[in-house]
Every structure is written in structure tokens, then in C-alpha cells.
């Protein structure tokens, strides 16, 4: 049994046509940091597609690396959902396919430093009949309207990693 891991850097995502997270390149002191900026007051989304090569069974785990643009406290509610299509089998129109029910996680800013890197994981259990080698569309969003999302300012997503079992 092995774990398949798919790294998804910010450039792998397409912002939603309406309320999409902004792609940013922050110069940094020693190196640039690419990120997707999710607003505190507007629900913003990004999308990425991948092939579920060697998917076996079980839930997907989405690990997010993020930091606050300016805040040094508060909570961020992240959400994710997938839509899976089996090529040559499913009759669903690829342009109108619906997403499965979202899964969310609330992650707390650990304080003291505004641009401190944080990590959280979302267990995606609504799998939309996922099968090996499916085309999978992934949506990630910040649920700015959730009562538990209390962090002011942008949350900047620097990396996402999707993992699943091949058995």
C-alpha cells in the first residue's frame, strides 16, 4: 500500500470567473513567494484539475500551507470539494458537472507573527463516485461568511497537496 501525493502550487490553480482568489507574487527578502490571496469578506475560490492515477479507495486528504497577509490572530475556514468524471463511462457533460458536498476545516492563526506559515488538512469524504484514472476537478475556497472565520485580511495559500491510497 502506497500513498499517492499530488503537489499543487498556486500556479496550478485557475481563479473562479467571479470572486476568484488573486494570484500574488510577494518579493520577500531572500526569495519570491507565490500565493493565492483569499479575502476575509468575500467567498473566493480557485480550481485545479488532475487525474486520479492509481486511486484505490478511501478519502482524499488535502493539506494546505497558508499564511496571513497582515493578521496575527483569528481563524480561517477553508473548504474543498471535488467533481469526478470517468472518461468513456460517465455521460455527464464535463462543462456542467456538479461538485460533491464540500468538506471544511477551521485553522487558527498561531499568533505573534503576521506572515507565519500554517498548515491544515481537509478530509474530503464526499468523493462523487471517484474511481482510478478519473478526471477530478478540485475547488478550494475560503468560507468568509462562516461564523468561525474570524481572521481579518487575506489568507494566502502557498501550496496544496492532495493525497490518497492506491489500494
Functional labels for PLM-detected ranges:
Residues 72-80, 153-157:
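Short coil-to-beta strand junction motifs in C2/discoidin
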Amino acid at each position: 500500500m502506497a500513498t499517492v501525493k499530488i503537489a499543487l502550487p498556486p500556479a496550478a490553480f485557475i481563479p473562479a470567473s467571479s470572486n476568484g482568489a488573486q494570484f500574488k507574487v510577494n518579493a520577500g527578502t531572500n526569495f519570491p513567494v507565490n500565493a493565492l490571496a483569499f479575502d476575509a469578506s468575500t467567498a473566493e475560490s480557485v480550481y485545479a484539475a488532475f487525474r486520479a492515477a492509481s486511486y484505490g479507495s478511501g478519502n482524499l486528504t488535502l493539506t494546505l500551507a497558508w499564511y496571513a497577509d497582515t493578521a496575527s490572530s483569528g481563524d480561517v475556514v477553508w473548504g474543498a470539494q471535488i467533481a469526478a468524471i470517468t472518461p468513456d463511462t460517465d455521460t455527464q457533460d464535463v462543462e456542467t458537472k456538479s461538485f460533491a458536498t464540500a468538506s471544511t476545516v477551521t485553522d487558527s492563526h498561531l499568533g505573534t507573527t503576521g506572515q507565519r506559515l500554517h498548515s491544515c488538512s481537509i478530509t474530503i469524504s464526499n468523493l462523487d463516485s471517484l474511481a482510478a484514472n478519473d478526471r477530478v476537478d478540485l475547488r478550494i475556497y475560503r468560507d468568509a461568511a462562516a461564523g468561525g472565520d474570524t481572521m481579518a485580511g487575506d489568507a494566502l495559500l502557498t501550496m496544496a497537496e492532495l493525497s490518497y491510497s492506491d489500494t
